[in-house]
């Protein structure tokens, strides 16, 4: 109901932690500083009622499926889909914390696309359904290089490859 939503949503909140209140009778757990949970809770949000935008800046057709929009810059290509958004948040968290060795995604064919290898100057060579590393660039630890890596991940990984890496929690 609208009344229940209004008690859970604080329209003035600027992060998920300050925008989305725990339901009545519940408390938010304490999470360690620099943990992924803390990162998600403190990630900046766009103002309340902001529309979800597509890569080209147009509005997504269903604007009733979200209660908040992360202040995450859009990329120009139509690559970031459902699972890609989850992969991006994880990768952004590890990149921001300098934990580059933890950025690793399996492509749909099972190939392990390690960001540490990418930033060392290796690039992924695809030949049919096979992938391999080829040293073809200079080492680069810039954010632009990270975004190029993520474009490859978005192109060749997705829900299927994430499912093989996911662990159940219950």
Regions found by a protein language model. Name each.
Residues 109-126:
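Charged, often glycine-rich, active-site loop that binds/positions anionic groups
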Residues 127-150:
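Low-complexity, serine/threonine/proline-enriched polar segments
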Residues 144-170:
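...with weaker cross-activation on analogous glycine-rich loops/strands in unrelated enzymes
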Residues 73-78, 94-108:
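Surface-exposed patches in mature extracellular/periplasmic domains of secreted proteins
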Residues 2-64, 68, 73-81:
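N-terminal module-boundary/linker segments of secreted carbohydrate-active enzymes
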Residues 78, 82-85, 89-90, 142, ...:
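Stable alpha-helical elements in mature extracytoplasmic
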Residues 35-38, 114-117, 145-149:
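Exposed alpha-helical structural elements
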Residues 90-97, 126, 153-157, 161:
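Sec/Tat-exported extracytoplasmic proteins
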């Amino acid at each position: 109901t609208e009344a229940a939503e209004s008690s859970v949503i604080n329209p003035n909140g600027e992060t998920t932690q300050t925008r989305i209140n725990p339901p009545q009778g519940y408390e938010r757990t304490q999470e360690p500083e620099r943990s992924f949970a803390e990162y998600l809770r403190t990630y900046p949000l766009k103002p309340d009622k902001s529309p979800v935008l597509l890569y080209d800046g147009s509005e997504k057709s269903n604007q009733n499926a979200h209660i908040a929009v992360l202040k995450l810059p859009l990329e120009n290509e139509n690559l970031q889909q459902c699972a890609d958004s989850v992969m991006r948040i994880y990768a952004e968290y590890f990149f921001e914390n300098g934990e580059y060795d933890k950025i690793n995604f399996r492509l749909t064919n099972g190939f392990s696309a390690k960001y540490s290898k990418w930033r060392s100057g290796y690039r992924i060579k695809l030949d049919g359904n096979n992938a391999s590393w080829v040293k073809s660039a200079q080492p680069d630890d810039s954010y632009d290089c990270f975004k190029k890596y993520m474009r490859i991940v978005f192109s060749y990984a997705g829900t299927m490859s994430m499912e093989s890496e996911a662990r159940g929690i219950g």
